Amino acid sequence: MDWGTLHTFIGGVNKHSTSIGKVWITVIFIFRVMILVVAAQEVWGDEQEDFVCNTLQPGCKNVCYDHFFPVSHIRLWALQLIFVSTPALLVAMHVAYYRHETTRKFRRGEKRNDFKDIEDIKKQKVRIEGSLWWTYTSSIFFRIIFEAAFMYVFYFLYNGYHLPWVLKCGIDPCPNLVDCFISRPTEKTVFTIFMISASVICMLLNVAELCYLLLKVCFRRSKRAQTQKNHPNHALKESKQNEMNELISDSGQNAITGFPS
């Protein structure tokens, strides 16, 4: 897996994220990706080779290992990072579409007063509002779901987050109940708890960011309603102006198509 590509991809979304979102991206790469690349492969590099059972029955060791570890910790963590990072693709695609439309309008002369050139459009920080707000909040919601789902999968597959010193296995073709031992169980337990804790922190950051965006929208709407309440004439004038613009637009379209309004 090319983690550099993942860093470049999510780093591009970082430009349009909130402050909490930037902290989330930092936690993802420092406490999860870097730890997974640097340390996890060393800790779990001897998984099946150093899994020992006190029997010489052919196939017993492999069957017991597959029973207790159906999926490798490293592969499951890597899959979790991919799923958690994928919703950022929604935001990246939305921003790319917005820039494409803005560039098209700029070339048609509709955005000449807003931007100097096309490079200025590319450097613009897109505000999280309108349709982008829905896309951004949806991506956060999916990240929360994926984090919680993978934490449950970890607990379900391994019967908790603690790796025992001795595993009792009585699955065929084992002749009887045999004892199996894994390498460095304490170190792997500490590492597992650390990765789960990082997942919890990321999930809490996602919840905090989602609450922040919801409160921000509520505050903005409350402020807008208060403004309309304090200046009803201005709001009425603005409403009439919008209706007049719609009538003018409809009249223009009817004149072009040749149908009466």
Swiss-Prot record:
Reported disease: Ectodermal dysplasia 2, Clouston type: A form of ectodermal dysplasia, a heterogeneous group of disorders due to abnormal development of two or more ectodermal structures such as hair, teeth, nails and sweat glands, with or without any additional clinical sign. Each combination of clinical features represents a different type of ectodermal dysplasia. ECTD2 is an autosomal dominant condition characterized by atrichosis, nail hypoplasia and deformities, hyperpigmentation of the skin, normal teeth, normal sweat and sebaceous gland function. Palmoplantar hyperkeratosis is a frequent feature.
Q: What are its GO cellular component terms?
A: actin filament; apical plasma membrane; cell junction; connexin complex; gap junction
Outline which residue ranges sit on the Extracellular face.
Answer: 46-75, 155-192
Give membrane topology per the record. Answer: Multi-pass membrane protein
GO BP term, pick one: cell-cell signaling
Q: What's the protein here called?
A: Gap junction beta-6 protein
Q: Identify the domain of life.
A: Eukaryota
Entries under PANTHER family matching the protein:
CONNEXIN, GAP JUNCTION BETA-6 PROTEIN
The encoding gene is: GJB6
Its annotated function is as follows:
One gap junction consists of a cluster of closely packed pairs of transmembrane channels, the connexons, through which materials of low MW diffuse from one cell to a neighboring cell.
Transmembrane annotation, as ranges = 23-45, 76-98, 132-154, 193-215
Compartments, record wording: Cell membrane; Cell junction, Gap junction
**Family recorded in the similarity comment:** Belongs to the connexin family. Beta-type (group I) subfamily.
- Assembly and oligomerization: A connexon is composed of a hexamer of connexins. Interacts with CNST.
Q: Does the keyword Cell membrane apply?
A: yes
Pfam families (alphabetical): Connexin
Q: Name one GO molecular function term.
A: gap junction channel activity
Listed A to Z, the keywords are: Cell junction, Cell membrane, Deafness, Disease variant, Ectodermal dysplasia, Gap junction, Hearing, Membrane, Non-syndromic deafness, Palmoplantar keratoderma, Transmembrane, Transmembrane helix
Q: Which residues lie on this side of the membrane: Cytoplasmic?
A: 1-22, 99-131, 216-261
